[in-house]
């Protein structure tokens, strides 16, 4: 059996880890341009 809850948690963690820094970089770039 596949534990979908564990997979969902891992995917959400991966998305947060990947998207978090990207959002911070984009915000810093936008503030720098303004």
Swiss-Prot record:
Principal subcellular localization: plastid
Transmembrane segments: 6-26
Superkingdom field: Eukaryota
Subcellular location(s) per record: Plastid, Chloroplast thylakoid membrane
Keyword terms: Chloroplast, Membrane, Photosynthesis, Photosystem II, Plastid, Thylakoid, Transmembrane, Transmembrane helix
Topology of the protein relative to the lipid bilayer: Single-pass membrane protein
GO biological process: photosynthesis
Any GO CC annotation of this UniProt entry: chloroplast thylakoid membrane
NCBIfam families: PRK13686.1
Subunit structure: PSII is composed of 1 copy each of membrane proteins PsbA, PsbB, PsbC, PsbD, PsbE, PsbF, PsbH, PsbI, PsbJ, PsbK, PsbL, PsbM, PsbT, PsbX, PsbY, PsbZ, Psb30/Ycf12, peripheral proteins of the oxygen-evolving complex and a large number of cofactors. It forms dimeric complexes.
Family: Belongs to the Psb30/Ycf12 family.
General function of this protein: A core subunit of photosystem II (PSII), probably helps stabilize the reaction center.
Name of this protein: Photosystem II reaction center protein Psb30
